[in-house]
Amino acid sequence: MIPYGKQSISEEDINEVVKVLRSDFITQGPLVPKFEKKISNYTGARYCVAVNSATSALHIACLALDLGIGDYLWTSPNSFVASANCALYCGAKVDFVDIDESTFNISISELEKKLEVAKAENKLPKIVVPVHFSGASCEMERIFELSKIYGFKVLEDASHAVGADYKSTKVGSCQFSDMAVFSFHPVKIITTAEGGVVLTNNQNFAEKMRTLRSHGITKDSESFVADFSGPWKYEQQDLGFNYRLTDIQACLGISQLKRLDEFVAKRRDLARKYSDEFRDVSGIEIPSTDFLETSSWHLYVIRVKSSAKREPLFNYLRNQGIGVNVHYIPIHLQPFYKNLGFKKGDFPSSEDYYE
């Protein structure tokens, strides 16, 4: 079976992990900050905070942006549920913005219309989470412009887009956002087994997230509230979590990062070949070639024009040993979100894309 997604682990990756297993620190050692620094250098963002998953990254990013009860977070229905769940973890409400029918990312025109309505109703979002579906960046410059007009923060869910480009920057630079999140799950571009990071250019956000990922505890004496002495001193200043990444995972990430550009180049080459081969095949639609050289191509999505033929094709390919998958069932159509009041017909472009 050709899997839907699979990590690429080299002998160098294995050797680096073995070195850490033989070292003094397998967690809370020097390699997590080293990994963070390398990701910062790659993307151009000033700060990077590594955690145990992209879901955790979205959660602490929302908390650092003070999302809470009474607030709204907007995101795309065409994503994994974590893009929306992060709002609910904070006690906030979630809503969605329908997608563009050619890019399958958040529709700028739908966002503009929804913001005007929300302004009139005094229900503007505190955070908007654009999702870079399949590895192609949303129109971040325009979204960032809208954030200045309407007063919301921008948190990029770039889980699919490690190594992707946008205009003259790397996705994750946060040139047009307040924060960006990467995923290092094994099916993504590079892996740390499980893991994720938050990138930002705001020092206060970074410091807040570093505290939140480790139980809300700080050992920075300059930030202590109480007047205690002793080199053993630490303070819990917030209600945090155990979202730490281990040194074992960080060293794998450091090793994988050396091949990131190679991985992305190979994915772009495959996307180019797929597009050439499938362009004249009847009954299907292939992805837009507008972002052929900028997407990281986490996914190459073929749309079957007849929904009645999708499942037979899916089963046929699986039976031929090709591990295809379907992305995504719109979040608002999940039973949990239907119980929150969402229903079929709320976001027709996302529903049409899925169907």
Show the residue positions of the predicted features.
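N-terminal "arm"/small-domain region of PLP-dependent enzymes with the aminotransferase-like
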Residues: 1-25, 30, 234-237
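Conserved active-site segment immediately N-terminal to the catalytic lysine
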Residues: 156, 160-191, 232-236
